[in-house]
């Protein structure tokens, strides 16, 4: 089976981490026995500060590389009217098609196309699949709230795109149901893949160590990092407990978090290490991971923390309800610091020895490791491929 992945965003180079989970998933499926390739379009708007990149994109040629077992073709595309997604995709299609032909000449014709997220990949893959008679799969990772539909024509267009996919996948049950309301059709869900490198981690005994509570995110308002601080303070875990919040720090974000900690009386317990490159190492120090997001389609950070044996506390989101099962942590219906603090205090009393952490880790691996993920997507690809001959 030869699958060509078309993601809506993807690392710009082997060193880039933006969209790295698309690369990790494709590499994992290649390791599971499939031939995997990537066709990565990068849209560049013809307005705003980066308009020159948009102009250059009109003359972009496909760039072919082989990266850690993956055949990759990247192409820059001009975004003429990003809010008119159907028109935009059609305007960029001829350049995408040239990149697709370059891929086929070098690596062969795929059996199935797999688009990640509706725009731009879903729209572009729809056009490619229709022209070349290829079955395709659509996995949506976002809630699409940032992509409102402004016209009846726009709504019909995106529903037409989604309807043509052989299988439609969300990343959690609630997320799949929500996306189905907008795009129509039957949506199944497959949880995201735990990065395979985390499958081989070992857990350690924390029972004799001071308690460490942590949070890791992009630190934007949706993640509510200030609420992590307020909830930690409300938990009243004692002066020895530490709170570590990782993520990219601007001067404004750091000042806001430190002021919040001063007001909550936990300034001396707060650590802000900034951007985290070793996610596993960050999580291995934690006893409790807190994610009080407004919304999470899935929440990769939850399974990454659970894989190291940390207990989880999260607000009621689609992702939290998918990831957190009995014994993994607590889902809190409210964003009230007192209730979140009570949940943090509750899980802080759970066993922190090696056996306790190993139980939580095994709960994660049984549901999100490569074996479960690969089996589900192999079945999805087989159904999609069969639909082309039905």
Residue map of PLM features:
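Conserved acidic donor-binding segment of nucleotide-sugar-dependent glycosyltransferases
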Residues: 326, 330-337, 346-351
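Short hydrophobic beta-strand element within catalytic cores of glycosyltransferases
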Residues: 311-314
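Conserved donor-binding/catalytic core segment of Leloir-type glycosyltransferases
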Residues: 4, 205-232, 244
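Aromatic "clamp/platform" in nucleotide-sugar-dependent glycosyltransferases that forms part
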Residues: 275, 294
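N-terminal subdomain of nucleotide-sugar transferases
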Residues: 1-60, 66, 389
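Glycosyltransferase donor-sugar binding loop
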Residues: 216, 242-256
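A charged, aromatic-enriched C-terminal amphipathic alpha-helix characteristic of glycosyltransferases
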Residues: 352-382
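Carbohydrate-associated surface elements
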Residues: 174, 193
